[in-house]
Regions:
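Nucleotide-activated chemistry modules centered on ATP-dependent adenylation/adenylyltransferase
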Residues: 1-251
């Protein structure tokens, strides 16, 4: 059985994503969790507590249990030679968040929903374990980079072409095949091919990726159905604030 999880960082984007998922997909059983660093700001704790009431529960994860240091942050700060986390050494994310999430998941096939907005050009820090698949519901492209690279790889071209012919409406066959049959070059690389397919039809693209994933061991491919493939929402900063305010959780 495939698990669905969503990490609550205490930031606005992950909080809004949790509310969005609960409201838009009420039949999807999502395990919400928070990785406690022991050094959160008071307003962060207030937001998480309000969110917990709205969601009906958040599992609290805490790294470095049994450490003589008063908080997980101080434990890993000392272990790193008192070097604070930085863009080059993100031990806070790796040790206190990703590692704890991976322990929480274990070896179960799991879909992890990540709150990166549609107006952000980044992938975020996600697990590389093969049983954990990241999904980005706020973006036009909900799939992770590794999935896109597989899907658009020249070695899978015939398989993907065949899948598209199965899921594609007749009026979109020609423009989609034109994109698919255009070889990857320095001027027409993965991201351009991806955006060209998304611009034709997001939902058809998602259906094609989903059918492709059924031929792999990735978690989404193990599902009998995946409702997010019919979603073409793109949420940006203003939408995040609206979700938080309209829910009553607040910002």
């Amino acid at each position: 059985m495939v698990r669905h999880i969503l990490g609550i960082s205490g930031g606005k984007d992950s909080a809004a994503l949790a509310i969005y998922m609960k409201d838009k997909y009420p039949d999807l059983k999502v395990d919400y969790y928070n990785s406690d660093t022991g050094c959160e700001l008071e307003e962060t704790e207030v937001l998480i507590n309000r969110l917990e009431s709205y969601l009906g529960g958040i599992t609290r994860l805490r790294a470095a249990e049994g450490s003589p240091e008063p908080t997980p942050f101080e434990h890993f700060l000392k272990a790193s030679g008192n070097f604070l986390p930085s863009p080059q050494a993100r031990w806070c994310t790796q040790k206190m968040k990703l590692a704890e999430m991976e322990k929480f998941v274990g070896d179960e096939p799991t879909i992890s929903y990540v709150g990166i907005r549609g107006d952000e050009e980044r992938e975020g820090y996600v697990s590389t374990k093969p049983n954990i698949q990241a999904i980005f519901p706020f973006r036009k492209n909900i799939w992770s980079l590794d999935v896109i690279n597989q899907f658009l790889s020249p070695k899978n071209a015939e398989k993907v072409r065949s899948i598209y012919l199965q899921v594609c409406p007749d009026n979109l066959v020609d423009p989609i095949l034109k994109v698919l049959d255009t070889p990857l070059t320095r001027d027409f690389y993965y991201s351009k091919k991806l955006n060209a397919l998304l611009d034709i039809d997001v939902k058809v693209f998602n259906k094609a990726v989903y059918e492709y994933l059924k031929t792999t061991d990735l978690p989404v491919g193990q599902l009998d159905e995946f409702p997010l493939i019919d979603n073409d929402d793109v949420l940006v900063k203003d939408d995040i604030f609206s979700i938080l305010e309209d829910s009553g959780v607040g910002v």
